[in-house]
Amino acid sequence: FGTTSEGNSLSVEERVNLLETLVEGNIPPAMLMPSTGTCALTETVRLTKYAVSKGCAGVLMLPPFYYKAVDDDALFASYSEVIQQVGSSMLRIYLYNIPPISQVPISLTLIGKLLKHYPDVVVGLKDSSGNWDNTAAVLQEYPSLATFCGSEKFLLDILRHGGAGTITATANINTSNICNLFKNWKSSDAEELQEKITAIRQIFDGHALIP
């Protein structure tokens, strides 16, 4: 239930029902990372609890995004409250940084504070900032964090810098090339594979993906 799938246009009940349908359809929960971050604390907690109860590998969590210019202390308090209310040792959070949409960036300072207080819970980040310098800074500062880029244009770069990979909607239509590069990023033709991937991604970048 991420950005391209318009997850935040769905009600909590719809998101719960969709997740239940996926699990009942024999999609292994260990392969699922539903997005559970909303503007309402109670809704985020409910969605996250449900994902944990279903055995999902983790949750992708936006910060509360309606109010802008919120400082790191306030964002830390929000994430902390969710973690405490969910209250499960099985919870694994992947922070979702997408400032072009949310207008609420997840800073290096906030990441560090969350890792210090919740090292077993906050385990990863999807960086959809669209700014490679930001992604590179996260990789350098927090090498143990499972960091994903939000655009496959950076897939080879992120793998070469120790990142985890990419989480991208367009992987649904460019699956073969992206999987090939992910598996063979050390090969001699890795640059060529990346060029193919980038060319296809740029076609979509020229259009609005959300109607």
Across the structure, where does each feature detected by a protein language model lie?
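Active-site beta->alpha loop and helix N-cap motifs at the rims of alpha/beta catalytic domains
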Residues: 1-105, 122
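Catalytic alpha/beta core domains of metabolic enzymes, predominantly
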Residues: 85-91, 99-207
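NAD(P)-dependent Rossmann-like dehydrogenase/reductase catalytic/cofactor-binding core
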Residues: 210-211
